[in-house]
Regions:
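Acidic helix N-cap motif at the loop->helix transition within catalytic regions
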Residues: 17-19, 44-52, 93, 97
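Short, acidic, metal-binding catalytic loop of nucleotide-sugar glycosyltransferases
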Residues: 23-32
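A conserved acidic beta->alpha catalytic loop
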Residues: 24, 39-48, 65, 89
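Glycine-rich, basic loop-to-helix element that forms the pyrophosphate-binding segment
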Residues: 63-80, 90, 101
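Short aromatic/hydrophobic "clamp" motif used to bind/position activated sugar donors
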Residues: 85
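Conserved donor NDP-sugar-binding/catalytic core segment of glycosyltransferases
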Residues: 97-135
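Conserved nucleotide-sugar donor-binding catalytic segment
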Residues: 142-230
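C-terminal subregions of glycosyltransferases and related glycan-biosynthesis enzymes
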Residues: 195, 202, 209, 213-317
Length: 317
């Protein structure tokens, strides 16, 4: 008999967290599961720790070279036998009842995707300091369906005022992915989740969100990401939005096309902002000013960014 659910765990150099992660999957109240762990060429003790577990529900895939989370998740989907698949990052963990609760909602609502709230855990901390829906409790106080327009609009707004549903780790009907030839895009890490969920919605998926939190999401301290990494991620969001704008289902939907186009413009503006702020931090105001005045294109960009810079500055106070 095939398992109900396949839990897919890409793992790369997470020896500090992998035991808690894996045990949270093995100890689910829903026992009819399989766990597919993809060791992505870890150079620490991650694989050694995983291989200590004799549980027959655990399958290990070993990559000889590092491929990235999106590629590994696709390997997991290809190997999966479950009716449903669900991702778990190797530095995160599940509440014991997570799979059981999501599966029950999926059956009741005839859903293709079901996501829950997230507990946010700061790295090196033990207790949650917030949840994904903390900024929108009224909007997510009960189970609700999310359409593609709402999904993109919520992700477009600043995280301080809007939950980014691209961060969720939903239970996904495996047959829906296979029938629609959908998979993670490995080249846009770490936003491959956002793209996959958007494409599912464009294909007509029924995506349900529940207010309860059963997923513990570990994240770095605020502001720890480098400007280079921020710009890289923003470039990926630009590429993803341009790709979405090319889809027939977007072109035929004026409201959707408008909001994605607006999202693209906002991301491009954010990217330009960081291209100005980083030199200010590294070189100082005077040196950056002299460089800007000597470069007409950079001067144009800077002048264009002044209203946006002021808006960001006052919104943070």
């Amino acid at each position: 008999m095939n398992p109900k659910v396949s839990i897919i765990i890409p793992a790369y150099n997470t020896e500090q967290y992998i035991t808690q992660c894996l045990e949270s999957a093995l100890n689910q109240t829903e026992q009819n599961i399989e766990i597919i762990l993809i060791n992505d060429a870890s150079t620490d003790q991650t694989l050694t720790l995983v291989e200590k577990y004799p549980d027959s529900r655990l399958k290990i895939i070993k990559n000889e070279v590092n491929r990235g989370a999106g590629y590994c998740r696709n390997q997991g989907i290809q190997a999966a036998q479950g009716e449903w698949i669900v991702p778990l990052d190797s530095d995160d963990w599940y509440a014991p009842e997570r799979i059981e609760k999501l599966w029950q909602v999926a059956q009741r609502e005839n859903a293709d995707l079901v996501a829950d709230n997230l507990y946010f855990i700061q790295d090196e901390k033990y207790d949650p300091n917030a949840t994904l829906f903390s900024v929108a409790k009224d909007e997510f106080s009960q189970t609700r369906e999310i359409d593609v327009l709402t999904f993109i609009d919520l992700n477009r707004k600043p995280g301080k005022i809007s939950p980014h549903l691209g961060l969720t780790k939903p239970l996904i009907k495996r047959s829906f992915l296979l029938e629609n030839s959908l998979a993670y895009e490995a080249t846009v890490t770490p936003i491959e989740d956002f793209l996959l969920y958007t494409l599912c919605l464009l294909k007509g998926a029924r995506f349900m969100i529940i207010p309860e939190a059963y997923y513990y999401y570990r994240r770095s301290r605020p502001g720890s990401a480098s400007t280079f990494r921020k710009v890289k991620i923003l470039n990926q969001f630009c590429a993803v939005n341009r790709y979405l704008l090319e889809q027939d289902s977007v072109q035929s939907n004026p409201a959707l096309k408008k909001i994605i186009d607006q999202y693209l413009k906002e991301v491009e503006q954010e990217k330009d902002y960081y291209s100005i702020i980083q030199p200010l931090k590294e070189q100082g105001v005077l040196k950056t000013l002299l460089k800007t005045l000597s470069n007409f294109k950079l001067l144009q960009l800077t002048l264009k960014q002044i209203p946006y810079i002021l808006k960001r500055r006052f919104s943070q106070n």
